[in-house]
Amino acid sequence: LDSKGTGEPTCYVSYAYEEPYIRDDPNASDPFQLTFRDRTFIHPLYFHQPQDQPYTLSNGYLIEISYAEELLPLESVSLDNVEWRIALPSDTLRQKVRHVEPIGIPFTEEIQDGQRVAVFKLDKLQPDQAGLIGWKATVEMYGLKYFLTPAEVEDAPPLSPDFQAKYLVDDDELAMETDIISGAAAEAAGRETNVLRKMLRIRNYVYDQLSYGIQPKIDTPDVAWERGVASCGEYVGVLLALARLNGIACRTIGRYKCPATPEQKNLPLEPDFNHVWLEFFVPGLGWLPMESNVDDVIDQGPYPKRFFMGLSWYHTEIGKGISFEKMKADNKPEHLSLGDLAINHVRFTILEELNPTP
């Protein structure tokens, strides 16, 4: 349909699904009942393929993101010369930061490995001190999907020595030296040499062996593998270990997903959990995204490729390849964690829909 009178056709998509809701039944002894109802949603699909680029952008949203730490220490501890670092949203192919401002204490901005970081400094942090440490950002976020084929990367050059030293090593308790993980890595990739086919084989092999489940803490890949049930962070750990053992450079990406309710504009939305996925590197091309567990929806497959080399508009990329948040002080006790000092608050507000076409 030419909905805007521009002469260009607009593609409309119909989405049909079941929606859970609370039904009020006045005839029941317990009138409030959880049930489902059919819903159909029709909406235009906008997309843009930059010239000579192997990816497409689709519908996006302008979103206000706020992350704040409320100082509320659990212990009576005084800290001197405190430096509190919180990563800021990244500028990527599908994500553009329009504006950033502090919440509470002002910050200075630093660049760490190409990523923006808010740095908060306090001369002293007292046991009874109240306050907020954080930032608020206005960000454009779009859907992204690469349409590469294995044949297009068949002649990819080898990884540089710097990339091998940084992205093929066990730098985060990945248990890469254990028999169970090294054996899984060998079985996952087989004799495949093409980086795209190899990464997809590894992903599908992990999906065959693991099921999704939230755990009280993130275990190392060998523990999660033996258990057979893993959270998104544990999926990422296993995928990182198996990919790196097979010579594929990869790194963790996250940190949150905006609640996928674009009809709820100008309302503060709170994510249920944080979330992580990964990126893998194709020499000569760059970093490609891959979800951790979201495509693991069918027992023993076949698995969709929605998020293999693709992300939806609600994925929020913050501090790519670096730690999201760190704190140091002159006299910080070794056992003291961020959670002992503050409670974090995360909010998203969807402001308006965006068309990726320039």
Task: Please report, for each region that a protein language model flagged, where it lies by residue.
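Alpha-helical and coiled-coil interaction segments, frequently adjacent to or embedded
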Residues: 2-41, 307-358
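Intrinsically disordered, low-complexity N-terminal segments that are enriched in acidic
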Residues: 3-145
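A short, structured loop/turn motif at beta-sheet edges
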Residues: 77, 125-131, 193, 244-246, ...
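Terminal peptide-recognition signature
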Residues: 84, 202, 278
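A mature extracytoplasmic/lumenal domain signature
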Residues: 88-90, 137-139, 152, 254-256, ...
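Acidic low-complexity segments
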Residues: 110-115, 119, 126-226
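Active-site nucleophilic cysteine motif
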Residues: 198-202, 228-243
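Hydrophobic/aromatic-rich core segments of domains that either
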Residues: 234-332
